[in-house]
């Protein structure tokens, strides 16, 4: 049995989508227990494997992260993180304030001893539909080569245990594929990656080929990773908007759109981030999953599933054995 702590109040459409996702999760997985933290006046579920705990406070999206974690001691997010810290829960999921969740992860759950800096990891879609693991996407704006090496090790374990890839290929994001390309950070990181035997390093990868499906794990610093992530999100939204405007621009195009409807739906599903769940803060002494703030019930359900798999695979202990001291 895996037990997951869930923040009922975090996210743009909480608690509605959270309750829908939790209900579906406990119905689908008979070996899953949920501890749900939030406002009891908005709780409407009844299930033997859902334990509800009332919280008097909520961390808002506009709250300053560290101050919110320190001052709102009875918030759903803080209580959720404390359940992981105490060992009562195997992991936690929230769609709330990203900075606050990262602070809760660092200051309440705590780092694995030996991990210099945790990394925020996401799984992004690829043209072949399999997706790739990408980190760091914003946990740390600055990084040393040694940090990138740890990110590679953490990402390798994540790809193996969460995504089920036996021998993941790991690449370093750079401005060229040649070993000599890049700045001092990527050059030093390349040397460290090449000497390390704990993962399958396949060299540099350029941003233009990220979504081709050629690699399983891509490593970069948090500053670069966050910009790449937001660029991909923005590009996807723009393409979708332009495609819709083109289809609706004439009767002929509307007919073509009707003919291609199923194919367009298949394409949209292949590129849907919600299929992969949320982002995970790797390197902590517990599983912390961040669902997108605008998550629907499907995306939040995927994030719960993600945390459940992490618990089943004992991913935190494996990271301790591999990267920890």
From Swiss-Prot:
InterPro entries linked: FA_synthesis (IPR003664), Phospholipid_synth_PlsX-like (IPR012281)
SUPFAM superfamilies: Isocitrate/Isopropylmalate dehydrogenase-like
Keyword terms: Cytoplasm, Lipid biosynthesis, Lipid metabolism, Phospholipid biosynthesis, Phospholipid metabolism, Transferase
One GO BP annotation of this record: fatty acid biosynthetic process
Pfam family name, one: FA_synthesis
Catalytic reaction list: a fatty acyl-[ACP] + phosphate = an acyl phosphate + holo-[ACP]
Compartments in which it is found: Cytoplasm
Function text: Catalyzes the reversible formation of acyl-phosphate (acyl-PO(4)) from acyl-[acyl-carrier-protein] (acyl-ACP). This enzyme utilizes acyl-ACP as fatty acyl donor, but not acyl-CoA.
Similarity comment: family membership: Belongs to the PlsX family.
HAMAP family noted in UniProt: PlsX
Protein name: Phosphate acyltransferase
Organism: Staphylococcus epidermidis (strain ATCC 12228 / FDA PCI 1200)
Gene of this entry: plsX
């Amino acid at each position: 049995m895996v037990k997951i702590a869930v923040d009922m109040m975090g996210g743009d459409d909480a608690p509605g989508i959270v309750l829908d996702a939790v209900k579906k999760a406990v119905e689908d997985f008979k070996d899953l227990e949920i501890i749900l933290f939030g406002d009891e006046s908005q709780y409407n579920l009844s299930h033997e494997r859902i334990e509800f705990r009332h919280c008097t406070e909520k961390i808002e999206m506009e709250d300053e992260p560290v101050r919110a974690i320190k001052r709102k001691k009875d918030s759903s997010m803080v209580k959720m993180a404390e359940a992981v810290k105490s060992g009562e829960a195997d992991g936690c999921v929230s769609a709330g304030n990203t900075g606050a969740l990262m602070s809760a992860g660092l200051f309440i759950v705590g780092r694995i001893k030996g991990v210099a800096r945790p990394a925020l990891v996401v799984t992004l879609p690829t043209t072949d539909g399999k997706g790739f693991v990408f980190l760091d996407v914003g946990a740390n704006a600055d990084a040393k080569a040694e940090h990138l090496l740890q990110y590679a090790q953490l990402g390798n374990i994540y790809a193996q245990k969460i995504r089920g890839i036996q021998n993941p290929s790991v690449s370093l994001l750079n401005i060229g594929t040649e070993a000599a390309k890049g700045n001092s950070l990527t050059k030093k990181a390349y040397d460290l990656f090449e000497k390390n035997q704990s993962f399958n390093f396949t060299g540099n990868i350029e941003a233009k080929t990220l979504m081709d499906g050629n690699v399983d794990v891509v490593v970069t610093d948090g500053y670069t990773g966050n910009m790449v992530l937001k660029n991909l999100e923005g590009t996807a939204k723009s393409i979708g908007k332009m495609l819709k405007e083109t289809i609706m621009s004439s009767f002929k195009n509307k007919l073509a759109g009707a003919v291609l409807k199923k194919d367009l739906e298949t394409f949209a599903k292949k590129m849907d981030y919600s299929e992969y769940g949320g982002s995970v803060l790797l390197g902590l002494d517990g599983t912390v999953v961040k669902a997108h703030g605008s998550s629907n019930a499907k995306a939040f359900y995927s994030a719960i599933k993600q945390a459940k798999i992490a618990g089943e695979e004992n991913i935190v202990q494996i990271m301790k054995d591999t990267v920890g001291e």
